Amino acid sequence: MFETVIGLEVHVQLNTKTKIFCSCATSFGEEPNKNVCPVCLGLPGALPVLNGEAVKKAVSFAKAVNAKVNQNSIFARKNYFYPDLPKAYQISQFEIPIVGKGWLDIEVDGEKRRIGITRAHLEEDAGKNIHEGEISKVDLNRACTPLLEIVSEPDMRNSDEAIAYLKKLHSIVRYLEISDANMQEGSFRCDANVSIRPKGDEKLYTRVEIKNLNSFRFIQKAIEYEVERQIEAWQEGVYAKEVVQETRLFDTDKGVTRSMRGKEESADYRYFPDPDLLPVFIDATLMEEAEKIPELPDEKRARLVRDFGLKEYDAGVIVADLEMARFFETMLSEGASAKGAVTWLTVELLGRLKGESGVQNSPVDAKRLACLVKRIEDETISGKSAKEVLDVLVAEGGEVDAIIERLGLKQVSDDGAILSVIDEVLAQNGDKVAEYKSGKDKLFGFFVGQVMKSAKGVNPAKVNDLLKSRLG
């Protein structure tokens, strides 16, 4: 029996307006090499100047993950050669990062686990290599963009725990609004360090790094494949030969990892303090300002359960995504009940959006969905009719009340009007009334159906109550 050991390195691109060591814009999707300057290009004599906003965002993150802030930290040069690194070194942090040890709690299958965070440090991103046939091009727009690299302890024991940790981290940086964490655009990237060991053995065996994974699904598949590969090598007696310290890439088409290059040790990068940057001192004022963080997912979930009576699961679904949480709370402020808002947001609306990327792109805003929920709750329309209204809202837009009026979906809830229909139905079916009163309770459904058929649009709940009172 084997135990999996997983540690994750997550690169979060901070959403500052300008780069970390120069005033170039950080906007995504510009034409190649538009947002560059002598600092980005590593030209001789160009000196970096630290972006203070990046420091504030790092301190806010530290507060959110229960981590120590090193008020004195330094930047270091990480030396290696790669085409997208024009200086031939990356400005990073080594011995004294801004964020020290911290932790995050995760939950998998109802079991809670604490995952340690070793450190989080600021660094500049590299550029991007673009390969077109036999030609390779370099786009340096991304060079010098601020990154916060978050390094976990090797505390995760399976791919489910790794994904739970990543999703928690993803939510936190979005709630803090320090990053858009857009995985498709590379704002939230993950390197997974994976190894195995016999159960009960505390030794850490050879770890393999899987590089630049940018979707939760691919991260999980890559980890699972790599664990399977290492176990198979151990069982076949070729572990020492097949499992070496290296960097591997995940082939998304074939679902396998393949060797990219040997994995360097920290000594190979020849870190030394960057002589062009002064040590960073975080004073009390900056600490106080940066530590004013918003309500985080765990706190919000506890509040929704406590104050609105939501189930733990439903509250977890709501708070997992910042836009979803905002949508839900807007519905509450517009007068929808918490129970109705959960159902119509997470089941009905999201079920209709399907392939769309979350509620931020929903054609139905929170105010209109709240109005629909209120029309169900004040018995203007039935739940069945509300689904028709939502279909129209998604397809065409419009206002809830106008759609109800146009489709003639308004319920009849007047007791007198419903009673007159009930009396007419009972008078026409005297023999069945006698059978019902003699003990054939199943005939109640027949009477309900006849009333609903005779008077379309009547409130079913009212029909039930009034029928019971008439039949005695």
Curated annotation (Swiss-Prot):
Signal sequence range: none
GO process terms (BP): glutaminyl-tRNAGln biosynthesis via transamidation; translation
Substrates-to-products reaction catalysed: L-glutamyl-tRNA(Gln) + L-glutamine + ATP + H2O = L-glutaminyl-tRNA(Gln) + L-glutamate + ADP + phosphate + H(+); L-aspartyl-tRNA(Asn) + L-glutamine + ATP + H2O = L-asparaginyl-tRNA(Asn) + L-glutamate + ADP + phosphate + 2 H(+)
Class in the EC hierarchy, top level: ligase
Source taxon at top rank: Bacteria
Disulfide bond residue pairs: none
GO molecular function: asparaginyl-tRNA synthase (glutamine-hydrolyzing) activity; ATP binding; glutaminyl-tRNA synthase (glutamine-hydrolyzing) activity
Pfam families cross-referenced by the UniProt entry: GatB_N, GatB_Yqey
HAMAP family named in the record: GatB
Self-association and partners: Heterotrimer of A, B and C subunits.
Protein name: Aspartyl/glutamyl-tRNA(Asn/Gln) amidotransferase subunit B
Source organism (scientific name): Wolinella succinogenes (strain ATCC 29543 / DSM 1740 / CCUG 13145 / JCM 31913 / LMG 7466 / NCTC 11488 / FDC 602W)
